A protein has these predicted regions:
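TRNA-binding/sensing appendages of the translation machinery
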Residues: 1-89, 145, 166
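Short, conserved phosphate-binding/catalytic loop or strand-edge motifs used
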Residues: 125-131, 167-175
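Residue-level "edge-of-site" marker
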Residues: 51, 168, 190, 375
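Charged, compositionally biased N-terminal leader segments and the immediate start
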Residues: 1-11, 177, 182-189
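Acidic, His- and aromatic-enriched active-site or binding-groove loops in soluble protein domains
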Residues: 67-76, 182-204, 289
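Extended alpha-helical scaffolds
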Residues: 158-162, 170-173, 186
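Short low-complexity, flexible loop/linker segments enriched in glycine and/or proline
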Residues: 60-64, 179-180, 283, 383-387
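Positively charged, Gly/Ser-enriched RNA/tRNA-binding surfaces
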Residues: 2, 29-41, 52-53, 88-101, ...
Length: 425
C-alpha cells in the first residue's frame, strides 16, 4: 500500500473512524454522564478484555452476532481468538467464573468498544462504542423496571430531545407460536412479516397454514399490538394461551413499578417485537430519539446466558450505542461538550516563569490551561485554540488583560490577584 497517494479516509479500514477533538470530547462527555447515572444507581465498573477465545465467547452470542464476529489465529496458543461483538457475554463469563463469592444481585457497569463484521456495501460502522449495565441475580419484574427506569434517567440526564422506550416481551410471542406445527421456513416467513408489521402478507400466510381460527387470530393481532398501556388490555382479550397470559402479567407488574418510579410517561409497548428471540428470555426494550431511525439503547432479560458459562443465574441489562447518541444529539452536545481549553495564558518569553506559575495555580483550581509565548494572539488564532478565556500578561509581568472570545468582553487584573484566586474566571 502506497500511503503517499491515499486520502485520510483510505488510510484506515472501512467501517472505523478517527474521532478528532470536536467529536471525541462529545463521546467522552456522553460516557461521563452515563457512568455518573450508573454509579448513582449503585453499579460497579468492570473492564473486560479486548480479546476472547472464540469457542468461549460464542457460548454467549445470539445467532445474529455469530456471523459478525471478527476472528483470527493466535500464534501463541494456536487457538482462534475473537474481538467481542458485544460486551454482555463477557460480563456473563466474568460473573460466572470469577465472582463466586459476590453477593446477589450483582450490579455491574462497563464502557468499551466492540467490533462487528459488516457487509462492505452496507456502509455501517464496524466499531461500536458501548456503555451499559447488567443486573445479575434478580429474577423479579423489579429488576426489569430498574433497567428501563435507569435508561430513561440516562437520556434525561443527557438532555436528550423527545425520546421513548419501546417495551416488548418475547415470551408473549413464544406463547402464540406454542402448539403450532410450523416448519423453520414457515416460522421465518411469519417473523419477517411481523418484523415489517405487514398484516396483509401475514394474513395471506395464515391461509396456507393448518391452524385453528383462534391461533390465526392471535398471530394476526401481533402487528397491531403496539402503542400505550391499552395494548395490554387489547392483548389480554386476544390471546388464550397461558404462556402469553403470563407474559402480560409480567408486563403489568413492570409498568406498575415504573409508575412508582414516575418513569412511565415515555414508554410504549410493542408485543410484536421479535428482536433477539434466541437470546432474550422475557422483557426487552429499545430507546429511540425523535427523528433518528436507529435505537440508541437496547436491553432486556437473558436468564439463560450465564448458564453457558456454568452458573445459571437470572439477569437483565442494557447498553447504549454511544455513536448513535453522538449523531442523534449533535446539536445539543455542541453546547454541552466543546473542545479546547478553559484558559490560554499568553506572555513574552521574558515572563515565562510567571506564565508557568500562573498556569500551575489555575490547574489546581480545576481549570484546563495552556501556555503560549509571543505577541497577543488575534481572534483567528484564538478560535483555533478553542479557549474560553485569554489571559495576556503585560510586559511589566504583573498587569494582565482577560479577554472572552465568546462575549468579546475585556477585563483588567493582576497576576497577584489571579494567584490568590480572588478573580472569578
Amino acid at each position: 500500500m502506497n500511503v503517499q497517494n491515499l486520502s485520510s479516509e483510505a488510510m484506515i479500514p472501512k467501517g472505523v473512524k478517527d474521532f478528532l477533538p470536536v467529536n471525541a470530547v462529545k463521546i467522552h462527555y456522553i460516557q461521563e454522564q452515563l457512568h455518573r447515572t450508573f454509579k448513582a444507581w449503585g453499579y460497579q465498573t468492570i473492564i473486560p478484555p479486548a480479546l476472547e477465545f472464540l469457542n468461549v465467547l460464542e457460548r454467549g452470542l445470539g445467532s445474529d452476532l455469530h456471523s459478525c464476529t471478527q476472528r483470527f489465529d493466535d500464534r501463541h496458543s494456536g487457538e482462534l481468538l475473537a474481538f467481542p461483538p458485544d460486551i454482555t457475554p463477557q460480563v456473563a463469563r466474568i460473573f460466572a467464573t470469577r465472582m463466586h463469592e459476590a453477593p446477589l444481585p450483582q450490579r455491574l457497569s462497563y464502557t468499551g468498544r466492540v467490533l462487528r463484521h459488516t457487509e462492505q456495501q452496507a456502509g455501517k460502522n464496524r466499531e461500536i462504542f458501548q456503555s451499559g449495565v447488567e443486573m445479575i441475580g434478580n429474577p423479579s419484574p423489579s429488576a426489569d423496571a430498574e433497567m428501563i427506569a435507569m435508561a430513561l434517567e440516562c437520556l434525561e440526564e443527557l438532555n436528550a430531545p423527545e425520546y421513548t422506550i419501546d417495551i416488548g416481551q418475547v415470551e408473549f410471542y413464544r406463547g402464540v407460536l406454542q402448539g403450532l406445527s410450523l416448519n423453520p421456513q414457515q416460522k421465518r416467513t411469519i417473523e419477517q412479516h411481523l418484523l415489517h408489521k405487514d398484516s396483509s402478507s401475514l394474513k395471506a400466510e395464515m391461509e396456507t397454514l393448518n391452524i385453528s381460527s383462534t391461533q390465526a387470530d392471535e398471530l394476526l393481532a401481533l402487528p397491531r399490538l403496539f402503542g400505550g398501556r391499552e395494548v395490554l388490555e387489547h392483548a389480554d382479550g386476544v390471546v388464550t394461551n397461558e404462556r402469553s397470559k403470563r407474559a402480560l402479567d409480567n408486563l403489568h407488574e413492570v409498568i406498575r413499578i415504573l409508575e412508582l418510579y414516575q418513569a412511565d410517561a415515555r414508554i410504549t409497548l410493542d408485543l410484536g417485537e421479535l428482536r433477539g428471540l434466541d437470546y432474550y428470555s422475557g422483557v426487552t426494550f429499545q430507546g429511540f430519539l425523535s427523528g433518528f431511525g436507529e435505537a440508541v439503547c437496547l436491553g432486556g432479560r437473558y436468564d439463560d446466558l450465564t448458564a453457558n458459562y456454568g452458573r445459571p443465574t437470572p439477569a437483565t441489562g442494557f447498553a447504549f450505542n454511544l455513536l448513535n447518541l453522538l449523531f442523534s444529539m449533535s446539536d445539543i452536545l455542541e453546547e454541552a461538550a466543546q473542545p479546547g481549553v478553559d484558559i490560554l495564558v499568553n506572555a513574552t518569553e521574558k515572563h515565562d516563569s510567571i506564565a508557568y506559575k500562573l498556569a500551575h495555580q489555575l490547574r489546581k483550581e480545576d481549570k484546563s490551561v495552556c501556555t503560549r509565548f509571543g505577541t497577543e494572539p488575534d481572534a483567528h488564532e484564538l478560535r483555533k485554540f478553542h479557549c474560553r478565556t485569554l489571559i495576556n500578561i503585560s510586559t511589566d509581568g504583573e498587569k494582565v488583560t482577560l479577554f472572552s472570545p465568546k462575549t468579546k468582553q475585556t477585563r483588567q487584573s493582576t497576576v497577584s490577584a489571579l494567584l490568590s484566586a480572588s478573580v472569578d474566571l
